[in-house]
């Protein structure tokens, strides 16, 4: 069975790892996944990530972030734009997710960025996912 949505697979692995209270999670690497992880790290949702090679296949290992109480830094992470139904949005149409406590991750002409950064640059794009 082939995988049609690699980004959704990554988000599901991260969500399941947080539910299982795992420290690390790994999955096959790609440029778009690395860009999304850059945004998650910049916004403080994950600790760090490392890309490694195993048998000529690159894998990304993500160090998940928990609070002092052991609560996950990500409560919800969902795919918005899917291969069968792409979702595009102008920046003026994106309201703050969970009263500005969460973020949207966008793919714009200037690269992958959070909705906060997109507001500063005044640019819209494809809404990849939402994180809270």
From Swiss-Prot:
Keyword list, A-Z: Ribonucleoprotein, Ribosomal protein, RNA-binding, rRNA-binding
Signal peptide: none
Record GO cellular component, one term: ribonucleoprotein complex
GO biological process: translation
Record PANTHER family: 40S RIBOSOMAL PROTEIN S15A
NCBIfam families, A to Z: PRK00136.1
Subunit comment: Part of the 30S ribosomal subunit. Contacts proteins S5 and S12.
Family note: Belongs to the universal ribosomal protein uS8 family.
Record protein name field: Small ribosomal subunit protein uS8
Gene name in the database record: rpsH
